[in-house]
From Swiss-Prot:
Belongs to the PPR family. PCMP-H subfamily. Residues 375-469 are annotated as: Type DYW motif. It is found in: Mitochondrion. It comes from Arabidopsis thaliana. This is Pentatricopeptide repeat-containing protein At2g34370, mitochondrial. InterPro entries: DYW_dom (IPR032867), Pentatricopeptide_rpt (IPR002885), PPR_At4g14850-like_plant (IPR046960), TPR-like_helical_dom_sf (IPR011990). It comes from the Eukaryota. GO terms for molecular function: RNA binding; zinc ion binding. Residues 1-65 form a transit peptide. Disulfide bonds: none annotated.
Length: 469
């Protein structure tokens, strides 16, 4: 029976081979048995027609994944859809996938919105292997569900997978193109993002403001303000768009994020409309991130006069940690995003907070790294420290920032030369950025940092963002 089914698979047209392997896995009690027989039956010359490699087949992933959660649950009757929801809230993605298997065995199919929610979680915690399994569970029904899958792969740093989904879409709208452009720019591929916009225009599409916003973000990733300003001019010159305050804010953010604060202020002075609170808020945050505290404080005073409530809400979201007065949603984001580090093949997560001294070995390791950094000319950017204390104490406070502790912990608890990844819930400051460039040079490691805005890839003392963030 087994060999008969396998022989029939070979007669299927090429587009159906992938579906056939998935269907066959349900014909046997042992998924491992079905995978082994299919692998032996399908010749190597036919393997290239599969839309994904055979090892990504969901049945095979199920074979090699230890069902730890299923082993804990002796009675599968106690596993319900509420179990799945609870695991998703706890960001336990692998366990949630195991529950999907259990529910399917009981004849219950997890609904589409829940699967899309799980896809978003995969992108948030950068779980690429699990993301591919979730993708196998999803059959996108509309453009929005395709966008969710693209954003999932973007969060997992797999732009190739995202592009595959994009190219497979039967129909794309402007939001689709904007999503793909942001995906490439966020992952440090600004040139490809600009090329994607060029392709968008060449195919006869008309851009909207959201597309241009994505293009500005791509220009920041390559540090090309001239390209961005040309696109800004084309908005009203070539496409007749009526500019809003949000459009001006986007340009200001592009200029300031590229380090051109003088040009940003000149742009504000030349504007024909009165600057909004949002514009001053953008300048304030970017000044603080880049270490221009005095100028940022001036903008802060101006914001307080115009709208004091802005200073206690989302105005500081990109710079300071969430406050006690923030909403429950912000607390949930903090739970998911707060300084997590993967340091082993099992993808365990470790959380670090500023001032955390519970990992004595971590602090000691970073002090040792700091000595080596100072020897080759590193100068701590103490101007980003807001507390009015002596210079030495500022350096000490910078030492205990959560992202530095996370990298130090990973260095001493992982194999030599292995790339390291840190996720954080705030934008990185200039001191942290310079620190990680030096660490990548000293240790010979590739460091990957995802902050609130984008990815940073550090290698041999250089960052992929070219110091524009």
């Amino acid at each position: 029976m087994v060999r008969l089914v396998c022989s029939r698979i070979l007669k299927f047209p090429k587009p159906y081979l992938w579906s056939a392997t998935q269907t066959t896995s349900r014909c046997f009690n042992s998924r491992a048995q079905s995978h082994n027989l299919i692998t032996k039956t399908i010749t190597s010359s036919l393997q290239d027609v599969l839309t994904r490699p055979i090892w990504q087949n969901r049945s095979f992933v199920q074979c090699r994944r230890v069902s730890s959660y299923a082993q804990m649950v002796n009675n599968h009757q106690s596993v319900t859809i509420e179990t799945f929801d609870a695991l998703c809230k706890q960001v336990k993605i692998r366990e949630a996938l195991e529950v999907i298997d259990i529910l399917e065995d009981k004849g219950y199919i997890v609904d589409f919105p829940r699967l899309l929610g799980l896809a978003k979680l995969c992108g948030e915690v950068e779980a690429l292997e699990e993301a591919r399994v979730v993708h196998d569970c999803i059959t996108p029904l509309d453009a929005r569900s395709y966008h969710t899958v693209i954003e999932m792969y973007s969060g997992c740093r797999s732009t190739d997978d995202a592009l595959n989904v994009f190219n497979e879409m039967p129909k794309r709208n402007s939001e689709t193109w904007g999503t793909m452009i942001r995906c490439l720019a966020k992952n440090g591929e600004g040139e490809r993002a600009i090329d994607m916009f060029t392709r968008f225009i060449e195919e006869g599409n008309k851009p909207d403001k959201e597309i241009f916003k994505a293009v500005f973000f791509a220009c920041v990733s390559i540090g090309d303000i001239n390209e961005g300003l040309l696109h800004f001019e084309s908005m009203y010159r070539d496409y007749g768009m009526v500019l809003s305050m949000e459009d001006y804010v986007n340009v200001i953010e592009m200029l300031a994020a590229c380090g051109h604060l003088d040009e940003a202020l000149d742009f504000v002075e030349r504007m024909t409309v009165e600057p909004s609170v949002e514009m001053w808020e953008t300048l304030m945050n970017l000044c603080w991130v880049q270490g221009y505290l005095e100028l940022g404080d001036r903008f802060a005073e101006l914001i307080k006069k115009l709208d004091a409530s802005r200073m206690s809400k989302e105005s500081n979201a990109g710079l300071v940690a969430a406050k006690a007065s923030d909403s429950a949603m912000e607390k949930l984001k903090e739970l998911r995003y707060c300084q997590m580090i993967r340091d082993d093949p099992k993808k365990r997560m470790h959380e670090f907070r500023a001032g955390d001294t519970s990992h004595l070995g971590t602090v000691s390791a970073f002090r040792s790294l700091k000595v080596q950094m100072l020897d080759i000319g590193f100068v701590p950017a103490t101007r980003v420290c807001f507390v009015t204390v002596e210079e030495e104490e500022k350096e000490e406070q910078l030492l205990f920032r959560s992202n530095k502790l996370a990298f130090a912990h990973a260095i001493i608890n992982s194999e030599a030369r292995r790339p390291l990844t840190v996720l954080q819930n705030m934008r990185t400051c200039i001191d942290g950025h310079n620190t990680f460039k030096m660490i990548s040079l000293i240790t010979g490691r590739a460091l990957i940092q995802r902050d609130k805005k984008k990815y940073h890839f550090y290698k041999n003392g250089v960052c992929s963002c070219k110091d524009y963030w």
